[in-house]
Regions:
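Soluble N-terminal domains of membrane-associated systems
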Residues: 36, 40-43
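Functional transmembrane core segments of multi-pass inner-membrane proteins
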Residues: 141, 145-247, 285
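Interfacial loop-to-transmembrane junctions
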Residues: 216, 249-275
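Extended interfacial segments that mediate partner engagement and assembly in macromolecular machines
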Residues: 2-28, 43-187, 195
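Transmembrane helix-loop junctions in multipass membrane proteins, especially transporters and channels
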Residues: 25-34, 125-129, 177-181, 207-208, ...
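Juxtamembrane boundary at the C-terminal end of a transmembrane helix
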Residues: 277-285
Length: 285
């Protein structure tokens, strides 16, 4: 049964991952813009779900669209401070133009469904046939989409962060009522408030180093991590900071960025939360 469950999750992740690149392209815009309506050649974006689902390729001119905004990311050779990396991911307003941004290269489109499939399979393997697995599998593609957008343009749009937090809080309620649930809904809600509050304090202390989009993302990650208890919440949150620091250290060693370089922190927050959920699922089993 576990093998079948993992296989289904793997297929689900791969299938949904194939639909993410176009949405990531459309949402990878500057804060003053809502989303893209056309390809780089100017053709209207069409396709399933009003042009939101599918590969990053224009159906009219058959040209592949870039996975990040041209010119939005610089290629400086400075490195972030790995002790407290500059992780600002603004979601509204004007980006921090005083800090340089670390270079980012386009990820091959095959990586998106692969990463989504592996994430879903890992969640299925750790969680097993418990009701919360359905919630994890529904939320995982949107988390990957957020990571893609943040990686592309260093921002976490409200169109994704706020619905994700609401969905996590609402969907875990019915899951807690079903037999075999491995977590606590009240603790999940408190976890969202606590982690979101901690990130908000960090934002107030250093708004140039912590974007308000990170605060909103922390709400949803706190909910899912809090489902398995406070220890899992701490481990998942700490793992995000650790991964971000290691990434900054790698850039420093490679001389590809500087202390004032901004790095997208959302992908590390999400990866840390994934690790926390895997550990929490295994512990609950």
């Amino acid at each position: 049964m576990y093998a079948t469950l993992i296989a289904v999750a793997l297929v689900w992740g791969g299938a949904t991952g194939l639909l993410l690149p176009r949405a990531a392209y459309r949402l990878s815009v500057e804060p003053e813009d809502t989303w893209r309506d056309s390809c780089p050649a100017g053709h209207p974006i069409i396709g399933p779900a009003r042009g939101w689902l599918g590969g990053a390729r224009c159906a009219t001119c058959d040209a592949a669209v870039p996975s990040r905004t041209a010119g939005s990311l610089g290629g400086d050779t400075a490195t972030p401070d790995t002790a407290t990396p500059d992780t600002a991911t603004p979601d509204t307003g004007t980006p921090d133009t005083g800090s340089q941004q670390a270079p980012v290269t386009d990820a091959p489109s095959v990586l998106v469904p692969l990463i989504t499939a592996l994430a879903c399979a890992a969640l299925a393997a750790a969680t097993g046939p418990r009701p919360e697995l359905a919630v994890w599998l529904l939320l995982a593609p949107f988390a990957v989409l957020l990571a893609l957008v943040d990686r592309n343009v260093h921002r976490l749009p409200d169109q994704l962060t706020l619905p994700l937090a609401a969905a996590a809080a609402v969907l875990l309620g019915p899951a807690a009522l079903l037999p075999g649930a491995g977590g606590s809904w009240p603790t999940a809600l408190l976890g969202g408030l606590v982690l979101g509050g901690c990130y908000f304090v960090l934002f107030l202390i250093n708004p140039n180093g912590m974007g308000f989009g990170d605060v909103k993302l922390a709400l949803s990650l706190g909910v899912v991590l809090g489902w398995y208890g406070w220890l899992v919440l701490f481990v998942g949150a700490f793992a995000g900071f650790l991964l971000g620091s290691l990434y900054g250290l790698g850039l420093m060693l490679l001389r590809r960025a500087g202390r004032k370089s901004a790095i997208p922190f959302g992908p590390f927050m999400i990866t840390g939360a994934l690790l926390g959920l895997v550990l929490g699922g295994l512990a609950a089993a």
